[in-house]
Amino acid sequence: LHLSLRRQRQMCIRDSLSGVNACPRAKCEEYLRLSIDMQEPVKPTEQLVRDLKAAGYKLYVLSNMSREFIDFLRRFPVYGLFDGEVVSCEEGVVKPEPEIYRRLLGRYGLDPAQTLFIDDRPANIAAAAALGIRGQLFDHSAPAATCDLLRRRLLPRK
């Protein structure tokens, strides 16, 4: 199932499944539920969020996740540590479009030069950099190593 970015902006996963004829609606809904239920936060990432928050950092979510996945993540206690969020399915714009970064900066009064954007897609990092935001690529194949790198970069040495 391939959707243009424009279409993705306007829908959630459940909406996109409405056009799938190859699988009965109930099966698609079950697949969606199981896909979401199998997800869990990456443990090193959870701890990094806690460490950064304890060090006084302001933390924000900038995400292209669907409404269903964002609603799922909001149930985890660690999500409550974030100071705000800009989520594409609620905004009608997606990364790497410059407007979504501008909304994050404007909504929360962030200085691009003092903002670090962590993402798993080089195109999203490049789009942020074009607006003066520093970036760090997150490597899902080595989450602990990426979190350690960020800890060394951002937290004072003990």
Give the label of every model feature segment.
Residues P41-T45, D71, R121:
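Amphipathic coiled-coil/heptad-repeat helices and related helical stalk/stem segments
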Residues R7-Q8, L52, V61, E85, ...:
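Generic structural signal for small/hydrophobic residues in well-ordered secondary structure
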Residues S16-Y31, G84-E85:
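Short, basic/glycine-rich phosphate-binding loops at helix/coil junctions
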Residues L1-R9, I13-D15:
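Single conserved hydrophobic/aromatic residue that forms the stacking wall/gate
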Residues R25-Y60, P98:
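Short, acidic loop-to-helix structural element flanking the phosphoryl-transfer center
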Residues R14-L17, Y31-S35, F69, L73:
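Hydrophobic alpha-helical core bundles mediating ligand binding, dimerization, or RNAP-core interactions
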Residues S66-R67, L73-K158:
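Asp-based, Mg2+/Mn2+-dependent phosphohydrolase catalytic module
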